[in-house]
Amino acid sequence: MRIALLWVAFGALALAAFESIGSFRSEFVQTIRSEDGKIIEYRGRVYAKSPYYGLWKYEKPMEKEIYIVDKQVVIYEPALEQATVSSLQNSIDFMALLRQSKRNSEGIYEATVFEQKYQILADEKGEPQKVFFIDKLHNEVQIIFKNAEINPVLEKEMFLFMPSGEIDLIRQ
């Protein structure tokens, strides 16, 4: 659940120079370093579309999918055959956050979402490459995007959780 909350927080993130970004697709590597120095690495794919759609598909070390549509989050864990549905107080809008972030004097974009500060690095074309933040549990979180595509065609239906077969559905 902690990982999901990190992604939910991240889903709200953004870059100001990225006003022309309406959708985003990328592979990612997420590294979490705890206060005691332990490191956990996750790999997967992320999809985002304006105005408020997000999908994080974790592939390693375990499969997990996080679907975000406005204020609703569904965390699906195939190995457990269960999905958790939660409602948020605030909408998570990845694209709006990209547009809201501001470039500092060092060329790093910064955004604050729900009192959480994020730093975003962009390449020479102004495309998001890396995100860094320290979460509420004092973990250092770094997300590196690889093979990113800006403004790919993404159908809204891909962001809707449609379980196949029987699963346990938990509502929070």
Swiss-Prot record:
Q: Which domain of life is it from?
A: Bacteria
Q: Where is the signal peptide?
A: 1-16
Gene Ontology annotations of biological process type: lipoprotein transport
Q: Name one GO cellular component term.
A: periplasmic space
Keyword annotations for this protein, in alphabetical order, are: Chaperone, Periplasm, Protein transport, Signal, Transport
Q: How does it assemble?
A: Monomer.
Q: Describe the function of this protein.
A: Participates in the translocation of lipoproteins from the inner membrane to the outer membrane. Only forms a complex with a lipoprotein if the residue after the N-terminal Cys is not an aspartate (The Asp acts as a targeting signal to indicate that the lipoprotein should stay in the inner membrane).
Q: What is this protein called?
A: Outer-membrane lipoprotein carrier protein
Origin organism is Wolinella succinogenes (strain ATCC 29543 / DSM 1740 / CCUG 13145 / JCM 31913 / LMG 7466 / NCTC 11488 / FDC 602W)
Organism placement in taxonomy: Bacteria, Pseudomonadati, Campylobacterota, Epsilonproteobacteria, Campylobacterales
